């Protein structure tokens, strides 16, 4: 019936009724029809920008999963998917975004799982960043609001040093979003521009 179909797919009342009618009451065929139409709708949504989202991670792994609204960013299924992707990276050994997208997640790939949830939720969802390191690492996740999952994440790979210092460095990176790691990396023209600005505003 309609309720059973909605429970199985997360589809709206009208979509579920329409699918059951088209499938002539066949529950499995109705699920298939809803999945096809949902994935088609998800494909149409990919031109909408996913600018909200969350970060998730564990030892040596950090990911960013994007959605269109912070409403979806709070969704338990969305947060759960982010955690599952982190576990998929840990299991597969994927080191970058492309390898992660094709990593197995249940009976599908990570990318297929993201597309499937996008079809259910009705928003463009996208795995946008993946970092995975084997050395000593420190993970810092920051919440912009108490009712939201972490939306800023920093994964620092380091050699030597103490955990307190590394934690402070990670917090500084989260707060300031630095472009360069060391003074030597900063191009001379950038230094000159900053000097001119500082002199003009002094």
Which residue stretches match the model-derived regions?
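N-terminal assembly/interaction segments in proteins that build large macromolecular machines
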Residues: 1-202
């Amino acid at each position: 019936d309609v309720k059973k179909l909605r429970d199985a797919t997360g589809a709206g009342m009208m979509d579920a009724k329409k699918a059951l009618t088209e499938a002539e009451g066949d529950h499995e065929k109705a699920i298939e029809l809803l999945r096809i139409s949902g994935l088609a709708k998800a494909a149409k949504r990919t031109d909408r920008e996913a600018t909200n989202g969350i970060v998730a991670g564990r030892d040596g792994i950090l990911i960013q999963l994007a959605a269109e609204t912070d409403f979806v960013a709070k969704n338990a299924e969305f947060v759960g998917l982010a955690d599952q992707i982190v576990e998929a990276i840990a299991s597969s050994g994927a080191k970058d975004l492309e390898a992660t997208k094709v990593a197995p997640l249940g009976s599908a790939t990570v990318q297929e799982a993201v597309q499937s949830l996008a079809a259910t939720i009705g928003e463009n969802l996208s795995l946008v960043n993946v970092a995975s390191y084997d050395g000593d690492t420190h993970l810092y996740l920051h919440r912009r609001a108490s009712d939201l999952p972490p939306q800023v994440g920093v994964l620092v790979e380091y050699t030597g040093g103490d955990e307190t210092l590394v934690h402070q460095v990670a917090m500084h990176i989260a707060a300031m979003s630095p472009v360069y790691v060391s003074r030597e990396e900063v191009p001379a023209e950038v230094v000159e521009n900053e000097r001119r600005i500082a002199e003009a505003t002094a």
